Structures are given as C-alpha cells and as structure tokens.
Regions:
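Face-selective signature of the C-terminal outer-membrane beta-barrel domain
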Residues: 299-327, 350-500, 507, 511, ...
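Surface-exposed extracellular loop regions of Gram-negative outer-membrane beta-barrel proteins
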Residues: 485, 510-557, 574-592, 707-722
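Short, acidic Ser/Thr/Gly-rich low-complexity loop/linker segments typical of extracellular
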Residues: 46-61
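N-terminal periplasmic accessory domains that precede
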Residues: 96-101, 111, 141-144, 160-162, ...
Length: 772
C-alpha cells in the first residue's frame, strides 16, 4: 500500500512539474462592453524584468504560454485607455483571467495626444510593441518597421533594404528564425505581436553583426498562407517581385518562396580622371568621357523549407535555397590626354557575370530541463561563378589595346555551429558555443594572362558569454577563442586569437539609459584578394592578388545614451574603431612601368563617429518626424601614405498616416567612406511614397529623386603614383516611378513556430575582379 502511494505521489509530482512548465495566462481586454484591439499586454517580474508581451487580437484576446511558476505583474495599456496592472502571485498553473476591464482616457501633452509605441529596455535588447494605428496603416512588415522608427535603423522601401548606422549587417528574423527580406515584405502587420531589437548583439550573432531585428509573430497550428508583393516601374525595367506559400499539417510546416529582381537602364556612363606619375618625374592625366550605355542585372531566388515541431520541446528546420544572378555591362567612352585633347581614342568595355549558389541549411533546437537549450546548425554551399570581360582602346576599328579575361570559379564551403544556453539565476544567463567553417576555392583565370588557384581556408571558434542584471545595472562579459588557417600551394598562415567582449549598461529610469560596449575582433582577408593572380585592367593598369595577406585585429568602443520624453525621443551614439595592420590598397609601379593595384597589410586605420538622432511624434496619430546627423572622421596610415578625412552627413524623414492612407518622404546626403587611399562617395537621394490599404490589399506608388535630374555616385583615389577621380551616372535613377501591390490571404493558420536562433550563410565567391 505504501509503495502504491509513493508511486502515485511521484507520478502526481511529475505531472505537476510538467504542467508547471507549460503555464498559460490568457484573457480578454474590454472597454465599455467593446473588445480593445491591439492593446499592449506585458508580463514582467515584480522587479520589472520582461518575461513575455504582445498585443491583443481583433477580439481583444491574448494568451501567453510556457510561463514558469512564479510571481508576476501583468501590465495592460492601450492608446486612449488607462493602464491596468494585475498581480499574479505564486502563479503555478494556467490561469484564465476572463474579461479585463480598462477605462477610456486621453493623455494630452500640450494638446497633442501621446500615441507612441511602447518600448521596454531589456538588458540585451529593446522590446517594441506596435500601436494599433501602426498595425492598421502599415502595408507589410517592412513598412511597419519604418513606422516604428528603431534607433539607428534605416528602412529603404524603394530598394527593400534595412541597414544600420553602425558597421555590419542587419539580421532579420521571425520568431527567432532567420528571415529573408522577402519574408518581411509579405508579412501581415496584424500578425506582429512585437519586435525585439538587439542593437548590441552578443557573440552568438557573430563578430560583424550591427543589429538583429526579430519579428515576434502570432503562432499558428493549421492552415496555410499565400502572399504576393510586386514592385515594378511602368517606364523603366525595374522590378522586385516576391511570392510565398506556406502550408501546415499537424506538427509540420511546408514553405516555398520565390523572388525575382531585375534592373536594366540605357543611360549609364562614367567619367574618369586618372593621373600617372613616373619615376623620372614625368606625368600625364588621362580623361575618360563616358557615352550613355546599357547596364542590366537580374536574379532569381528560390527557397524550399520544411520544419517540424514537437510541443515546444524540440524543433527541426531544413531549407534548400538556390540563388542565380546574371549581369551585363557595356561601357563606351572617349579617351584623351588632358594636355592633348585632340588625340582621342575610343574605349569599349563589355563584361558579363553569372553566379549560381545552391545551399542546404539544417537546424535543430532542443529545450532541456532547468532552463537549458541546445542549438545545432549545419550549412553547406556551392558557388559557381563565370565571368568574362573584353576591353579595347583604339581609333575606328584599329585597336591599340585589346584585353580579354575570363574567370571560372568553384567554391565549396561548410559551416557547422553548436550553441548551449542556460539560465543560471533569475537575472543571469550563460551562453557558450563552437563554430567551424571550411572553404575550398578552385578558380581558373584565362585570356591575356592565365593562371589557376586552389585555396583552402579554415576557421574555428569557441566562445563563452555571461550576462546578468543587478537592479538598474546590466552587464555582459564574453571571451572568444579562434583559430584561422589559409593555404595556397606553399603560402599561407596559421593564427590563434583570444578575443574579449564587454557590455555595461545603466538604466536611470524607464525612459533613460546609457550603455558602453567594447570588443576586440579579427578580420580575415577575402579569398578573392589572396589569389596569386594578375588581371589586366587597361593599357596602363593591372590588378593583382596578394597571397601574403594576414589576419588583422579590430578594436571597437561604443558609448550610447537613449532617452524618451512624451512625444520626443533621442539617441546619442559615439563610436571609435582602430584597426591594426588592416588590409588596404596600395598602388605601385612595376619594372614594366605598369601601375599595379593590389592590397597589403598597412599600418593602421581609425574612425571616430559621433551621431545624434531625434524623433518627434506621432502628432495626433498622424505625423512623425525624425532627423539624424553625424560626423565621420578617418585616419588611414599605410606603409607609404597617410590620409585624414572628415565627412558630415544627415538623414531626415517625415511620415504621415490617416485612416487607410499612409505616405513618407525621406532624404539623405552623401555619407562618405574613406579606407586605405580611396574616398567612396555615398548616395545623395530622396524618396517619396504614398499607399492605400483595403483589407488584405495594399496599393501604392514610390518615386526616387523626383526633384532632381542628375544622379551620380563616385570616388577618389589619393595614390602618390596614380591618383584618380571618377563619377558614375544613371539617368533612370532620377524621377523613377514605381508602382507597388501587396496582397495576402491566410486560411485557418494556428501553427506555433519555435525560434531558430542562428544564421549561417556563405555568399563570397572568392574570385578576383578585373574591371575598374
């Protein structure tokens, strides 16, 4: 009898434990007998640590799952309503709060209604809850992101790009799973619960990630989803079209996505001024006056996805991708010596390129006991590259210079990664991981000069990172060990590194915080720069690889302050970066008096960047203004050169939305970059957009540079022996009109998506380019 009681008690305890690990909290928010749609619901601990959050659906309902036993506060707020806090003491089993009443209220600030999105500053991320108006007026996930105005994030709807003011890439995710921009373009705004913005990503996200934007969307269980996003110009061959299908069956999800991009213009040309200086003191300047020519590019991207989830315990995801890109460029110019303008030569350059990149991505995530998790990811990629270039200089049909080059490249790569995470205490977490990457590049160069290269590259890293919070102070300490190896015939390198990372933050209040971030990282030379290859550029210049390039060290420090006051918010950011022995360009004269452009490990490179960002709005739930400005100061030291450069830049944007209409106007000037001896001029452009949303259909228009008729980009080279300046013109980039249509339909989707937390990809072909 006692034995039976013990067994029954044990089973009961086990059931209680299992049940407690899946505690649910749900309810319905109502005001004056009407459901409150898009009300913000946040679950947090008694000391204000964020646990879960989101917004209510169209019927005022919300549900939070997988909550651990404990005592919490449930905070409910909504635009135009009084906030309400519900204490959930000793929560151990699922709880249905039923109908939760909140009262209407208007909060005025100088006769302007405060309707900004709720922002929660967590230790390692910002959690942003979209407002009801933002969810209703946005046409897709990208326009919603633009309306939410994340600090230091720029959204370009014309080019479908998301970038950061900081250096590095922006990772896009949905429920933690790596997402392409095509997924965001067909995401319904009403499916977005919140956005988690990692503006200081940890070691698990990689060394060169500027920010991570994670869309937390509603979980579904059954049904399917079909979406289309088309963006095309009626007068220029310019388009970006996306199509996605997802179908769910029990614990499985099947997905297909297709993207087509095309560009073709007939009024593209370039102007160059190049000076060549010889050892005897003589020199001359050659001028290239471009003639409008044709340039085109198009690409296809297809992805097949299958995922399987077992009740939140483990998750498997497999993705097969194929990307194909092809480009063609024709340049015609007149060439002459500045001192002898009557002696004109005709220059013709024709180049084509094709890249095919299939890949397989396998991902596994498992939740373990005691707040532990394990992630394993493996990605294999093959890149096939084919390109050719012809270049002639001469009079009529008599070429004086005739250059032809071809490149056939094959690159194979494998990336494997494992991550282990554990919650040590209620306010601290431990993360550790290993990553292994191996690449093999086999390239054949033909034409006037022929060669073959076989390059092997290996990178292995292991890291551990500990993060926590003490009252208003939060911290993170990380240490990464790495091994890098490169081999090409008898040349190569082996390098071991130990790299620390530190993040310290202090939150003065819910609306003001300050943060410091310091890190040391390594940058490896690209395979395309390390090949022992020479490619002729023109009659005077040669591009050469350098197999003696070595890994270099990057030191980076950032100090940031963020503040909010009613309708006003701002961000002050100061960053300093120092690179020791960076890989930068140099130009030398060889024994044949040819000017060889190559790369080498130079002395140092420094960048100082203060930036200020201010936001105002939304005013009366209609207008939002934002303005950012900063200064880039560069100090570039080579083995035989030293350059400094200062650039002031700005970006301004105004957004308006009223009922089903929304519009925006944004502009920015040149944000220039100086590296080595090259000054690269950033784009100076402005964009105007207007859209109308009706249920699942969104139609609109955008125009690029409607108020100017001269679009150009360019740069300068400050070499002692071969300085140059160039401008690239594209007439079609002025007054470019684009029509946009988004449509989606879902049927019975109730699928719960787990989080894929790593993103590995290889897109570097590893071939040396021969053009200017």
């Amino acid at each position: 009898m006692i034995k039976r009681i013990l067994v029954a008690t044990s089973l009961l305890c086990m059931c209680c434990i299992l049940f407690a690990q899946n505690v649910q909290v749900k309810g319905k928010v109502v005001s004056e007998n009407e459901a409150v749609e898009f009300a913000n619901v946040v679950l947090q601990t008694k000391d204000s640590i964020f646990i879960a959050g989101g917004v209510t659906d169209s019927k005022g309902r919300f549900m939070m799952e997988n909550i651990q036993a404990g005592s919490y506060l449930l905070c409910i707020s909504g635009m135009g309503y009084t906030s309400r806090i519900i204490s959930l003491d000793h929560l151990a089993v699922s709880k249905d709060l039923g109908v939760i009443m909140i009262s209407p209220e208007s909060i005025l600030l100088k006769e302007v209604v405060v309707t900004g999105a709720s922002v929660i500053n967590a230790a390692d991320r910002k959690i942003i809850l979209p407002t009801a108006h933002q969810l209703k007026s946005a046409g897709n996930g990208l326009s919603l992101l633009q309306q939410m105005k994340l600090s230091r994030i720029q959204v370009d709807q014309m080019r479908n790009k998301v970038t950061s003011s900081g250096e590095g890439d922006v990772q896009l995710r949905m429920n933690g799973v790596n997402a392409e921009i095509q997924d965001i373009l067909v995401l319904r705004p009403e499916d977005v619960i919140r956005i988690e913005y990692h503006d200081a990503p940890g070691l698990r996200y990689g060394d060169h990630t500027a920010a991570v934007i994670d869309y937390i969307v509603r979980r579904h269980e059954t049904g399917g989803y079909v979406a289309l996003d088309a963006q095309d110009s009626p007068h220029v061959l310019f388009g970006n079209n996306n199509f996605i299908v997802k179908i769910n069956h029990k614990k499985s999800e099947f997905g297909l996505n297709y993207n087509n991009v095309y560009r073709s213009v007939d009024n593209y040309w370039r102007n160059n001024w190049e000076t060549f200086r010889y050892e005897d003191g003589s020199s001359f300047t050659r001028v290239e006056d471009g003639i409008p020519s044709r340039i085109s590019t198009y690409g296809h991207n297809i992805g097949l996805n299958y995922s399987f989830q077992d009740q939140g315990k483990w998750f498997f995801n497999s993705t097969v991708r194929w990307a194909f890109n092809k480009n063609k460029q024709n340049n015609q110019s007149s060439l002459y010596i500045w001192e002898k303008p009557e002696e004109i030569l005709m220059m013709k350059e024709h180049s084509t390129g094709r890249t095919s990149r299939p890949s397989v991505d396998l991902y596994f995530q498992c939740k373990l006991n005691n707040d532990q998790s394990l992630i394993i990811n493996a990605v294999t990629t093959y890149i096939d590259t084919q390109s050719d270039r012809s270049y002639t200089e001469g009079k009529s049909n008599e070429p004086l210079t005739d250059i032809y080059s071809t490149v056939s490249g094959n690159k194979y790569s494998f990336i494997g990664e494992g991550i282990y995470e554990r919650k040590v205490t209620k306010k601290s977490r431990l993360s550790a991981g290993v990553k292994y990457q191996q690449s093999l590049a086999d390239n054949t160069y033909g034409g006037n000069e022929s060669s073959e290269t076989k390059m092997h590259e290996t990178h292995a890293t292991a890291y551990v990172e500990y993060s926590g919070k003490m009252d208003r102070f939060n911290y993170s300490f990380g240490l990464q060990g790495s091994y890098s190896r490169f081999k090409q015939k008898e040349e190569g390198y082996n390098r071991y590194s130990l790299l620390p990372r530190l993040r310290l933050g202090y939150q003065f209040s819910d609306n003001v915080f300050i943060r410091y971030r310091g890190q040391i990282s390594r940058k490896s030379p690209g395979l395309s720069d390390m090949g022992n290859v020479r490619q002729l550029i023109d009659s005077l210049q040669v591009r050469s690889g350098n197999p003696e390039l070595k890994i270099f060290t990057v030191y980076k420090n950032e100090l940031e302050a963020d503040f909010r006051k009613g309708l006003f918010s701002g961000n002050v950011h100061l960053s300093y970066q120092y690179q020791h022995r960076p890989i930068m360009e140099e130009t030398i004269r060889d024994k044949n008096n040819s000017f060889v452009r190559t790369n080498a490990n130079q002395l140092s490179w420094q960048k100082l960047n203060p930036e200020l960002e201010l936001k105002l709005g939304p005013l009366k739930d209609i207008l939002t203004f934002s303005f950012s400005t900063g200064i880039n100061y560069y100090d570039s030291r080579g083995l035989d050169y030293h350059h400094t450069y200062t650039n002031w830049y700005y970006r301004a944007e105004v957004m308006a939305s009223y009922k089903r209409w929304s519009g925006f106007f944004q502009m920015e000037n040149h944000r220039n970059n100086f590296y080595g001896e090259t000054l690269s001029y950033g784009e100076s452009f402005h964009t105007l957009g207007l859209s109308y949303r009706y249920k699942r259909l969104n139609i609109g228009m955008m125009t690029l540079n409607p108020f100017v008729d001269n679009y150009r980009m360019g740069g300068e080279m400050f070499s002692k022996v071969a300085p140059s300046k160039n401008w690239w013109y594209v007439k079609e980039s002025c007054r470019l009109f684009v029509a946009k249509v988004s449509w989606n339909i879902s049927f019975g989707r109730k699928y719960e998506t787990m989080q894929k937390r790593v993103n590995n990809e290889d897109s570097n072909a590893g071939t040396l380019k021969s053009g200017k």
